[in-house]
UniProtKB/Swiss-Prot annotation:
Subcellular location: Cytoplasm, Cytoskeleton; Cell membrane; Cell junction
Residue intervals of the FERM domain: 417-740
Residue ranges of ANK repeats: 284-313, 317-347, 351-381, 385-416
Membrane topology: Peripheral membrane protein
PROSITE patterns reported in the protein's UniProt record: ANK_REP_REGION, ANK_REPEAT, FERM_3
The organism of origin for this protein: Danio rerio (Zebrafish)
UniProt name for this protein: Krev interaction trapped protein 1
Taxonomy of the source species: Eukaryota, Metazoa, Chordata, Craniata, Vertebrata
Primary residence: cytoplasm
Pfam families from the UniProt entry: Ank_KRIT1, FERM_M, KRIT1_FRMD8_FERM_C, NUDIX_5
CDD domains: FERM_B-lobe (cd14473), FERM_C_CCM1 (cd13197)
Function, in words: Component of the CCM signaling pathway which is a crucial regulator of heart and vessel formation and integrity. Negative regulator of angiogenesis. Inhibits endothelial proliferation, apoptosis, migration, lumen formation and sprouting angiogenesis in primary endothelial cells. Plays a role in integrin signaling. Plays an important role in the maintenance of the intracellular reactive oxygen species (ROS) homeostasis to prevent oxidative cellular damage.
GO biological process entries: angiogenesis; anterior/posterior axis specification; atrioventricular valve morphogenesis; blood vessel development; blood vessel lumenization; blood vessel morphogenesis; cell redox homeostasis; endocardial cell development
Length: 740
């Protein structure tokens, strides 16, 4: 017994903050808490780091029992000496350990526990505590000083694992379901069941058939047997309830029965009516916009919309105002919500039914026609049972259902609305929106009629004058266009009325430079060239004067063809022509001093026999000269840096924060001078409080920089993806705006 091999294990005890997060398909780290313990750093008693619970168990023992007992014992100091009872033990995977245990492996086990209650936990020094998982993940990286390296690796893997589980139907509810022993209500043993193993040769039965029958009859006699059709099948079930009613008097003790007055029988029905009336009155008070839409009161509806009531608000039944208007056939109310309220015509209720479904169910042909005329309508939208509006109309056959069916059938044959997808040279392609404003980035990319090879280099961006965001494949660009004012307000201090968004086909910020260097397709090279030229002229490619002159001469060769001494004299490069080949920030300050050098290099390039004059070869040569520029291929964010102007005052410098596959770059917004360029591995970052700033620490010169920006959350998430801390296509970090 004493020589049993011990296995090192780590335990992640997690609990949800509330029950609603268990049924969400979207993973949010802030919905969970994790149990960590603080330990002092070696040789630094005052500095501490957080680690996961860890222990050693016998390799051949019952792991589940050992780990649950360890959690129970470890958590007694923080739960009034009662300990925390885990629901189950789930083995996630094994990890290689660092430090003294280098080369060894340790398993990470997940122990889910009950939803967080409102009782305050007792804090004891040296005991574990619960922390919000989102707060932990914000500062977690494999090089973070806040955690041991093993804990960092495990936390990053746990975050990714939880995100994956949220995409699997019923996985999260099953993880936090009560333990099997807690779900057993009654256990009845068959008295005829023989516990002893039957010996070969002779058949021995403990009871005769008559004795068995009499014993079973004495225990329980079933008059009717109904078999559960789900038993033994692979069908998933859910424990979701339709409605919960809590007795307000529960827990108040026994009532004084002498004071209870039973009303006369003729008043019983009236009392039930009163309860219903109270509920209806409460609904009217809480949701006036819903009531006015339900009744078709357009005058009140208009006033409420002017007063700022949201058309997206869902009531206690998870319906929005437009659902009531369509259900009850209120044409003018529906029109007002769509036009004045700018309501999404594809807005879903809690059961995933759309306004078009509600209008089709009721056979309200006029409303169906109104919705089908909306430019953003999704004609092919499906409800929770995968039924189209046409199907539900034919199933219910209400009111003018035949006319409604004709309208829906005609709509399926009509041409689709289109959206313009621009390229950086100003050209565009119109793409059909087969699903209205439910059309995703992935579907638009397929509609661009690009080859599979070309598609992998580019994606859809939404851009206005001062804000550009790369969208994720599952994002719905038309909905981003609709809510652009809100996005601009959330991410900047700009006036949203001055920002007009458009959709662009641009280079994917996640595209590795090694992959781009292998691109041979002329169309892909052209699109990459147009974007690189745009960035150069805007001043985003900060590099040496010599490099800028080389790029300018290449642009002259691409635009004007071979050098002609009669046409391309010194006066040829006036200010207007310079703007098409030189960064705008250099046109007035330096470009006039470069004209001779640019023309000389242009002439050399034209007469050089070693350089192909094929257009896509010249464009590729231009890209080759851009690849070693630090900021090439970066996504740019805006922010402010405070520097000391004197001992008592601070100077505010507005900066661009560039993030690409190379690292992070700070550029002066006014002068386009590159202040800082750090490669991954040479710096650390930390997201500030309320996502309002990001702190950057250079490992080489030990300097700290703080960039104040509303886009700090986006910057950190993109840094994590491009540095490899989270997978590029991982949805583990939920972000409603950008950078997939």
């Amino acid at each position: 017994m004493g020589n049993q091999e011990l296995e090192e294990v780590f335990v992640a005890v997690i609990r949800p903050k509330n029950t609603t997060s268990l049924n969400s398909k979207e993973y949010r780290a802030k919905s969970y808490e994790i149990l960590l313990i603080e330990v002092p750093l070696e040789g630094k008693e005052k500095k501490r780091k957080k680690v996961l619970l860890g222990t050693k168990i016998h390799a051949d023992s019952d792991r589940t029992k050992s780990i649950l007992e360890f959690v129970d014992e470890t958590t007694k100091p923080i739960s009034n000496n009662q300990g925390i009872i885990g629901k189950r033990v789930v083995h996630m995977r094994k990890f290689l350990l660092d430090g003294d245990s280098g080369g060894k492996e340790a398993s990470l086990f997940i122990v889910p526990i009950n939803v967080k209650d409102n009782s305050k936990s007792v804090h004891h020094p040296g005991s574990p505590s619960f922390y919000c998982l989102q707060d932990i993940m914000r500062v977690c990286s494999e090089t973070s000083a806040h955690f041991s390296s093993s804990t960092s690796k495990m936390l990053l893997a746990l975050d990714k694992w939880l995100a994956e589980q949220h995409t699997v139907p019923h996985a999260i509810p099953a993880l936090f379901r009560p333990a099997p022993v807690d779900r057993v209500k009654t256990n009845v043993s068959n008295p005829a069941y023989a516990v002893e193993k039957q010996t070969d040769g002779t058949l021995h039965m403990g009871y005769t058939a008559l004795e068995i029958k009499s014993k079973l009859m004495s225990l329980e006699k079933a008059d009717l047997c109904i078999q559960n059709p789900l038993y033994g099948s692979d069908l998933q079930y859910t424990n979701r309830v339709d409605k919960v009613i809590i007795n307000p008097y529960f827990g108040l003790g026994a009532p004084d029965y002498s004071k209870i007055q039973i009303p006369k029988r003729d008043k019983w029905q009236h009392s039930m009516t009163s309860v219903t009336e109270d509920k209806e009155r409460q609904w009217v008070d809480d949701f006036p916009l819903h009531r006015s839409a339900c009744e078709g009161d357009t005058e009140l509806l208009s006033k409420l919309l002017d007063g700022g009531f949201s058309v997206k608000q869902l009531d206690s039944d998870h319906w929005a105002p437009i659902h009531y208007a369509c259900w009850h056939g209120k044409v003018e109310a529906t029109k007002l919500l769509l036009e004045k309220g700018n309501c999404n015509p594809n807005l879903l209720n809690g059961q995933l039914s759309s306004p078009l479904h509600f209008a089709a169910i009721g056979g309200h042909a006029e409303i169906v026609q109104l919705l089908l005329q909306h430019p953003e309508i999704d004609r092919h939208i499906e409800d929770q049972q995968k039924r189209s509006p046409l199907q539900v109309c034919e199933e219910n056959k209400q009111n003018n259902w035949e006319e409604t069916v004709n309208l829906l059938q005609q709509a399926s044959n009509k041409p689709y609305e289109k959206v313009r997808i621009y390229r950086m040279d100003g050209s565009y392609r119109s793409v059909e929106l087969k699903h209205g404003n439910n059309t995703t980035v992935q579907q638009i990319m397929e509609g661009m009629r690009l080859s599979q090879e070309t598609q992998q280099y580019f994606t859809i961006w939404i851009c206005s004058e001062n804000l550009s965001l790369q969208l994720k494949p599952y994002h719905k660009p038309l909905q981003h266009l609709r809510m652009w004012s809100e996005i601009v307000t959330d991410l900047t201090a700009l006036d949203p009325q001055r920002e007009s968004p458009q959709l662009f086909l641009r280079r994917d910020v996640r595209l590795p430079l090694e992959v781009e260097k292998k691109v041979e397709d002329p169309l892909s090279i052209l699109i990459l060239f147009d974007e690189a030229r745009h960035c150069l002229l805007k001043g985003f490619l900060s590099t040496s004067d010599n490099k800028l002159i080389t790029l300018a001469s290449l642009l002259l060769q691409i635009i004007y063809g071979n050098y002609d001494s009669k046409k391309h004299k010194q006066g040829f490069l006036n200010e207007e022509n310079l703007k098409s080949i030189v960064p705008i920030s250099k046109v007035k300050s330096k470009a006039h001093h470069w004209t001779n050098r640019i023309l000389h290099e242009y002439k050399s390039l034209s007469t050089s026999e070693g350089v192909s004059k094929e257009m896509h070869h010249l464009q590729r040569l231009f890209l080759q000269n851009c690849w070693d520029i630090p900021t090439y291929g970066a996504a740019f964010f805006t922010g402010q840096v405070f520097t000391k102007a004197s001992s008592s005052t601070h100077k505010v410098i507005r900066v661009y924060v560039g993030v690409n596959t190379k690292g992070l770059h700070l550029m002066n917004m006014e002068t386009k001078v590159l202040h800082l360029s750090l490669e991954y591995g040479t710096f650390m970052w930390q997201l500030g409080q309320a996502d309002q700033y990001v702190q950057i620490h250079s490992l080489e010169n030990k300097k700290n920089f703080v960039v104040h920006t509303k886009q700090a959350g986006l910057i950190v998430k993109l840094l994590m993806k491009l540095s490899g801390q989270i997978a590029p296509n991982d949805r583990a970090v939920s972000d409603k705006y950008a950078y997939g």
